[in-house]
């Protein structure tokens, strides 16, 4: 998990922007591309495609999705 975040929230996959930090199956990923087929996400160990309709994003200190 990344250093400091202020909680999580579930959002529709279509609203996730590239660079947004998210959690999927207990791991932390960075969103890459959001296409009709799914949300491409990666971390330093693996890449994955998330096809679920909603994803869990990490929040910053202002309660907004954390983007790196």
Where do the model's predicted regions map?
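Basic/aromatic-rich interaction segments and small domains that mediate binding to polyanionic partners
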Residues: 27-52, 58
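Intrinsically disordered, low-complexity, charged/polar segments
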Residues: 2-6, 49-68
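Mixed-charge, Lys/Arg-rich low-complexity intrinsically disordered regions
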Residues: 1-17
């Amino acid at each position: 998990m990344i250093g400091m975040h202020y909680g999580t929230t579930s959002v529709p996959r279509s609203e996730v922007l590239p660079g947004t930090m998210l959690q999927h199956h207990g791991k932390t990923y960075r969103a890459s591309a959001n296409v009709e087929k799914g949300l491409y996400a990666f971390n330093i160990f693996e890449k994955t495609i998330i096809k679920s309709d909603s994803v869990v994003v990490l929040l910053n200190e202002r309660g907004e999705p954390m983007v790196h």
